[in-house]
Amino acid sequence: MAGTSTRSVIRWAAVVAAVIFPVVLIGVGGPPQAVTSVVTFHPAVSDFQFITASETPPTQAQCASVGRRCFNATAMQNSYNLGPLYGHGFDGRGITIGIVDSFGSDTMAHDLRVFNDAFGLPHMCGEEGVTCGSGMPMFSELKQGNVNTTGQPPNNGTGLETHNLWALEVALDVEWAHAIAPGANILLIDTPTAEVLGVQGFPDFFKAEKFVIDNHLADVISQSFASGEEAFNSTQSLLNLRYAFEAARAQGVTMLAASGDSGSAATPKVPVKNPTPFPFPAVWWPASDPLVTGVGGTYLCTDPNTGLAVDSGSPPAQCQTNPGVREVGWIAAGGGFSHVFPRPLFQNVLPAGSTTIPATARGVPDIGYQASSRTGVLVYITNPGYTGIVCPDGSLCSAGWYVVGGTSSGSPQWAALIAIADQINGGPLGFINPALYKIGSDPARYAADFYDVTTGNNGSSAPVPGYPATTGWDPVTGLGTPNAAVFLPDLVQAVHGN
C-alpha cells in the first residue's frame, strides 16, 4: 500500500481547490459496456426534518417538539467513544476522505463554516472566509464535466434529479465526515448527472471514482447512494460497473456504502418518485458488493447533548420503549441477502448467535451506525431558490438546520473512522472486510470492539417481512456499531493478520 506522504504529494499537486475534468479523461479503464437500463439510483438520505432557519443550532426542546432528538458533534463523538483517540492526536490528519455525490453544492464552503462555528470544530482550508495555515485539513472539490449546481436540471417529469435532495446529501456527508475525523482532508467528488440516467448517470459515478483511485486522490471513499440489485437490466450490467472497486482493492483504497433506507426491500427500475418496492426481500448495491463495506443503521438512544449515557426518556418511542438500550435496529435500515453475490469467504465465520448467512448469498450490511432522523444528526444547509421550506413566520426559507437520517449518515462517518485508523496505521488500510470478520470471530475482541445491537428490525416495507436485529451479525446492523477507541487500533492489527 502506498504511504500517506506519497499519496499526499500526488494528491495535493493535482487538487488544490476545485478541479474540473471532462468525462472523456476518465473513461480509460472503464467498463467493457455501458449500463443499458434506466436505473433508479438515488442519494440514500431519505429521512429528514427541517427545524430552524437560524444559524444557531436548534435546542433539544425544538427537536422534541417534532418527535426527534438531535445530535451535535460532541455527542456523536462521545456516543462512539472517540475522545481517547483525539486525546492521542488521532483525528485523521494526513488522510483524505473522498465523498461522491451528484451536482455538489455551491454553498458547501459557506455551510461548512457555519457548521464548524456552531459546534467548535476545527476550520478547514477551503471554507468560506478561512485563511489557510500550515497543517490545516483541506476541503476541496473535484468536478466531473460541467457540473451545474445553481439551477435545477431537466428531470423528465420524474423529479428524481432534484438538486435539493442531493444538496442535503452533500451537506450531510461533508459536515459529518469532518465532525468525526476533524483532522482529515475531504475531497468532494461531483458528477453532473443523477440516478434516472442509467446509461450515463451510473457510469459517471464509477468513472469518477476510478479517476480518484488511479490518481491517488483519496484513501477512503464514502458512497451515500444506492440502487436495488434487481433494478439493473441484467446481472452483467451491474458487474460491468465493479471496475472501480477492483481498482480500489488493488491500490489500497477503502470503499464504503450506505445499505439503503427501505428496510428489507428494494425498488424496481421505474423512473418515478417513490416507486413501489419489489414484492420480495432484496438488497441495495453497491453495499451488497463484497468489495465494499456496507453500512446499516440504528436508532441511537444516547444523550444527544453529551453522548455520555443512555437516555430512555426523550423521543423517539423506539428509545422510550426500550429502557437502558443504547441502540435499536432502525426499521428502514437496508439489509438482507444478495441475489447477485454468493457468501464471501470473510463471512464464513460469524460471532456466536448470529443470523445465518446462506452459502448462496452475501449478507448485507457488514457494520452499523446511527441512521434514523428520529435520533438524527444536525446538518446546516443553504439551498437558494428552494421553496419547500416555510419558516415559523410563514415566509419561505432558503437556509437552516435539519435533523437528518438515513444510512447515508453512517457511510461518511464510517469513512471518517477509517481515516483515523489509516492515520494510526501510518497509511491506508485498504480492503477491510476480512479484518472486520476476523475481529467478529474472536469473542473477546468482538465484545470489546463492537456495540452489539440486538433489538429492533428492518420491516418497513410491508408486506415484505423484515429481519430482526440479533446477537452477533444480523441483516439490520451487521456486526454492530463501533467502540472506536478500542476498535480502530484493533482493526489495524486485524488488517495485518494479528
Please place each PLM-identified region on the residue numbering:
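Membrane-interface anchoring segments and C-terminal beta-barrel signals
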Residues: 2-6, 448-449
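Secretory targeting and sorting signals
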Residues: 4-34
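N-terminal start and proteolytic maturation junction detector
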Residues: 22-25, 324, 348
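Substrate-binding/charge-relay-adjacent region of secreted/lumenal peptidase catalytic domains
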Residues: 32-294, 338-406, 411, 422-431, ...
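Polar, glycine-rich mid-to-C-terminal structural blocks
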Residues: 294-340
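An often Trp-containing, charged/polar helix-loop segment at the C-terminal end
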Residues: 354, 422-475
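Walker A/P-loop NTP-binding active-site region of P-loop NTPases
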Residues: 417
